[in-house]
Amino acid sequence: MNMDIEARVKKVITSCIAVDVDSINGQTHLVEDLYADSLDLIDIVFGLSEEFDISCNENDLPDMMTFADICRVVKKSLESRV
């Protein structure tokens, strides 16, 4: 399941930012490494909400700066639904 979540998170990121999926790893920073701007970050948050059917908004951004952070937030949101 973790690999599925990671692959889906990568899909969301690459649909919002023009980057190669292979350039994303656990410590990839959205702003510093992928040069995401504020609109990209909001697109990612809303993309995650749609992809995983979770409640996620721009207030979650401070906790979602790296790929690993995003996966952790998504997993936590999915677990809280159960």
Curated annotation (Swiss-Prot):
Keywords from the named record: Cytoplasm, Phosphopantetheine, Phosphoprotein
Location of the protein in the cell: Cytoplasm
Segments forming domain Carrier: 3-78
Biological function: Acyl carrier protein.
GO biological process terms on file: lipid A biosynthetic process
InterPro entries linked to this entry: ACP, ACP-like_sf, PP-bd_ACP
Main location: cytoplasm
UniProt entry tagged with the keyword Nucleus: no
GO cellular component: cytosol; membrane
Source organism of this protein record: Salmonella typhimurium (strain LT2 / SGSC1412 / ATCC 700720)
Protein's recorded name: Probable acyl carrier protein IacP
GO MF term set: acyl binding; acyl carrier activity
Post-translational modification summary for this protein: 4'-phosphopantetheine is transferred from CoA to a specific serine of apo-IacP.
O-(pantetheine 4'-phosphoryl)serine carried by residues: 38
Keyword Nucleotide-binding attributed: no
